[in-house]
Amino acid sequence: MEKITLTRPDDWHLHLRDGEALKAVLPDTVRQFARAIVMPNLKPPVRTVAEAAAYHDRILAAIPPGRTFEPLMTLYLTDNTSPAEIQAAKESGFVKAVKYYPAGATTNSDLGVTDIRKCDAVFEAMQTVDLPLLLHGEVTDHRVDVFDREKVFIETYLRPLKERFPQLRIVLEHITTKDAVEFVLASDEKVAATITPQHLLFNRNSIFQGGIRPHFYCLPILKRETHREALLEAATSGNPKFFLGTDSAPHGRDRKESDCGCAGCYSALHALELYATVFEAADALDKLEGFASFYGPDFYQLPRNTEKITLTKTPWQIPDALPFPESSLVPLWAGQELSWKFAPVA
């Protein structure tokens, strides 16, 4: 197959940052995706509808001329989020979900939830108005092995949460384990998951090949090969409970290559080419459009896009670095040659 035509996809988990960084990275996302669920972990985080509206406006102002893009906003859940804020979020029309970060779990999550059980009144309100909950599904207990934190979160917090709020729509984001796949498969239609390109392409060996490879470091961290294989099977199965979410997370090279490097992989530049590489290797290119273009909007109860994009068999090399404010930005798998190339349909 030399060419694939797909309905224009959406990214259901994206970090855009703010200010000059936003202006630097947004064009990459806008080129490939029609919409994106935008993460709220700025400094300070996006905690209210008013803050989400202001951030929404800043994103719209940064869209390159001649491009169309719809940012789908989220609120950052804290111990102090109120049911009234949830009602306002639902009524806003542009806030599409609420994001749960365990305090300290990942970049800019210090103000996250200290105990998920403190948020039951908020979850009740979300269930009532049908506003989805997006989960960074890891525990932060330092006694739990970093490779086990997703599994422990599912057993300790997610199963009880689902039992307490059976009608709450939940997205377990950037899943990394066979345990997460099995939980989603065993749950009803109100539970779904996003999967990143890095967790489909690589296992934890990639972080340590010939030394420390900081540009493969993300959270949740890459896992062993058996987990990657389970994710691959889920993503390419055609099951609508699994859909595209890049978790593209830009950090300047100096923030990645340091004695305390930041977690995150930048894939917005070449996300669809990476996913196509994965699906082709699995002999499942016929399943790519559902994963990338259909299952996400269906879960979020939004219309599917009508525009088309193409991927053609055109070899090209991922750049070693991209421009970024006061630094440079190293894309995921920098220097690698890919055989698929993205193009919009004229």
UniProtKB/Swiss-Prot annotation:
Stated name of the protein: Dihydroorotase
Organism: Picosynechococcus sp. (strain ATCC 27264 / PCC 7002 / PR-6) (Agmenellum quadruplicatum)
Regions that span the bilayer: none
GO cellular component: cytosol
HAMAP family per record: PyrC_classII (MF_00219)
Catalysed reactions, semicolon-separated: (S)-dihydroorotate + H2O = N-carbamoyl-L-aspartate + H(+)
Entry similarity comment: Belongs to the metallo-dependent hydrolases superfamily. DHOase family. Class II DHOase subfamily.
UniProt keyword Hydrolase present: yes
Domain of life of the organism encoding this protein: Bacteria
CC cofactor: Zn(2+)
Chain positions recorded as Zn(2+) 2 binding sites: K99, H136, H174
NCBIfam families (UniProt xref): pyrC_dimer (TIGR00856)
Gene Ontology terms, MF aspect: dihydroorotase activity; zinc ion binding
The protein's Enzyme Commission number: 3.5.2.3
A Gene Ontology BP annotation from the UniProt entry: 'de novo' UMP biosynthetic process
Modified residues (N6-carboxylysine): K99
The protein's enzyme class: hydrolase
Binding partners and assembly: Homodimer.
Catalytic center residues: D247
Xref: PANTHER family: DIHYDROOROTASE (PTHR43137:SF1)
Binding note for cofactor: Binds 2 Zn(2+) ions per subunit.
